[in-house]
Regions:
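Active-site donor-binding segments of glycosyltransferases and PAPS-dependent sulfotransferases
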Residues: 16-86
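Conserved donor-binding/catalytic core segment of Leloir-type glycosyltransferases
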Residues: 182-201, 205-219
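Acidic donor-binding loop of glycosyltransferase active sites
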Residues: 254-266, 279
Length: 412
C-alpha cells in the first residue's frame, strides 16, 4: 500500500525490460521509484490547465491523446492499461501485449454505479455523461482489436475481458511486495481495515457494522473524500488513524487478529499483504479476492460473506470469533501470499512476452533480436532514481531498446 497496484506492475515491467522508454498521458507521480529512473514521454494533456489536479476532467481527450504517440520505431509494445493505454497505434509487424487491470469499468458494467456515486443519475449532465461513456465504450471495443496478446490481473478480470472484448486473456496475478512484509504468529485483539476512503471500497459498511458490535475493536488506516462520513459513523470502538507510513501499516497488519475487506476489487492487494503478515482475511466474496484468499480446504486463510451488507459482515465476524484457536495458521497465510510475489510476476510476465514475440518472429520468418532480462535476474537497479526521470500518472507507454531491436511499453 505504498503505491497503487498499477505503479507496482509498471515497476516490475521495467525490471523485466530495464532499458524501456516510458510514455504516459500525464506525469505527476510524487513517488517516482516505480519508474526505476526512466524518463517519461507525456501527451499534450500534460500541458493543459489544471492537468495535475483535474486530469480526469480531460477524459474525452484520452483516446485522442494516446493515439498521438508515434511508436512506429518499436518492434515490441507493452501496455499496462486501466483505460486507454492499450489503444496506442501499432502495425502488423509489431507485437502489442497488454496487461489489463480492467476494461474501463465506469464505461462498461459499472457505469450505473459510477453515475449514481457522481450524482449523475438524472438530468442534463447525466445525458451528457452517458453520451460520453457511449463514445468511450465504442472506442474501447475497437482499440482492443489492436492488441495481439492480452493478460489479465485475475480470473475475474479475464471474465470481464471475455464479456467486453470477446477475447481470451492469460491470467498473470499482479506483484505484491511480500519480501518486505514479515510474518507474526501472535495477534492482538483488534480488527484492521486499510484503504483509500472512497465509496467503492465500502469502508463505511465496515465501520457501520462495527458500530453494532461495541465489544469488538476496529482500526481504520487511510484517508480520502469519505473521511467525514466515516468519522460520523464511527463508534468509540473504532479508531481512525488516517494516512500512515508503511512502518505503522506493517505493524498493524502483523498484529491484527483479522483484516476486514468489503470491496469488489479486480484483484485486491491489501488482503494479500495481510496474509503475508500471517493475518487471515474476512472478505466480501466477490471479485479477485476469491482467488487470493483460501476459504476452504485443509489450510484456509480467511472466510467470505455473501452479501455486501452490514448484517452479512456481522455474521461473518461472529463465525470468525466462534472458530477454535488455530483455525487459521499464520504460516499457511504467509505461504498463500507468496504465490503473488514480485519474482513470480516477473517470471510469468517475461515468459508471456517472450513466447509471444518469438511466435511473431517465426511468422515473419525472422529470428528474435530482442534482449529480454530473464525474470529471475530482473532486480531493481541499485539507485531507482536518476537525473532527468519524470513521474507517471494513470496512462503511459514505455519502450526498452536493444542494439538491433526496439521495444515499447505503454501504461494506463
Amino acid at each position: 500500500m505504498v503505491h497503487g497496484g498499477a505503479e507496482r506492475v509498471l515497476a516490475q515491467m521495467i525490471d523485466c525490460f530495464p532499458q524501456a522508454d516510458v510514455y504516459s498521458l500525464v506525469d505527476f507521480l510524487d513517488d517516482r521509484s516505480c519508474l526505476r529512473g526512466r524518463p517519461v514521454h507525456t501527451s499534450f494533456i500534460q500541458k493543459l490547465p489544471f492537468a495535475r489536479s483535474k486530469y480526469r476532467s480531460y477524459l474525452p481527450l484520452f483516446p485522442l491523446a494516446i493515439e498521438q504517440f508515434d511508436l512506429s520505431g518499436y518492434d515490441l509494445i507493452l501496455s499496462s492499461s486501466y483505460a486507454v493505454a492499450k489503444g496506442v497505434l501499432n502495425g502488423p509487424d509489431q507485437l502489442h501485449a497488454s496487461y489489463v487491470h480492467s476494461p474501463v469499468r465506469y464505461a462498461w458494467d459499472l457505469q450505473h454505479q459510477y453515475l449514481n456515486e457522481a450524482g449523475l443519475a438524472r438530468g442534463a449532465k447525466s445525458a451528457l455523461a452517458r453520451t460520453l461513456l457511449h463514445y468511450i465504450r465504442n472506442w474501447d471495443a475497437r482499440s482492443a482489436n489492436g492488441v495481439d496478446l492480452l493478460a489479465a490481473n485475475s480470473r475475474f478480470v479475464a471474465r470481464r475481458i471475455r464479456k467486453t472484448y470477446r477475447r481470451d486473456a492469460t491470467v498473470i496475478y499482479p506483484p505484491v511486495d511480500v519480501d518486505h512484509l514479515a510474518l507474526r504468529d501472535t495477534k492482538d485483539d483488534f480488527y484492521l481495515t486499510a484503504s483509500r476512503l472512497v465509496p467503492y471500497k465500502r469502508i463505511d459498511l465496515i465501520v457501520e457494522a462495527f458500530s453494532h458490535m461495541p465489544s469488538r475493536r476496529l482500526v481504520v488506516i487511510g484517508d480520502g473524500p469519505e473521511t467525514g462520513k466515516i468519522r460520523a459513523l464511527a463508534g468509540p470502538n473504532v479508531t481512525l488513524l488516517g494516512y500512515q507510513p508503511f512502518d505503522v501499516l506493517h505493524d498493524h497488519l502483523q498484529r491484527a487478529k483479522a483484516f476486514v475487506f468489503a470491496a469488489e476489487e479486480d484483484f485486491g492487494i491489501s488482503p494479500v499483504e495481510a496474509q503475508a503478515c500471517g493475518t487471515p482475511v474476512i472478505a466480501y466474496g466477490k471479485g479477485g479476492v476469491c482467488e487470493s484468499v483460501r476459504a476452504t480446504g485443509a489450510a484456509p486463510t480467511g472466510l467470505f460473506y455473501a452479501k455486501q451488507t452490514c448484517d452479512a459482515l456481522i455474521e461473518a465476524i461472529d463465525r470468525f470469533e466462534a472458530m477454535p484457536a488455530g483455525a487459521f495458521d499464520p504460516r499457511a497465510c504467509r505461504a498463500n501470499a507468496e504465490r503473488f510475489s514480485a519474482a513470480r510476476f516477473r517470471s510469468a510476465f517475461s515468459r508471456f512476452v517472450l513466447e509471444g514475440y518469438a511466435a511473431l518472429q517465426a511468422e515473419l520468418g525472422e529470428s528474435s533480436g530482442v534482449s529480454i532480462v530473464p525474470a529471475t535476474q530482473a532486480e531493481p537497479p541499485a539507485s531507482p532514481l536518476s537525473a532527468g526521470s519524470a513521474p507517471v500518472e494513470r496512462d503511459a507507454a514505455t519502450s526498452p531498446h536493444d542494439a538491433s531491436r526496439n521495444e515499447t511499453l505503454a501504461r494506463t
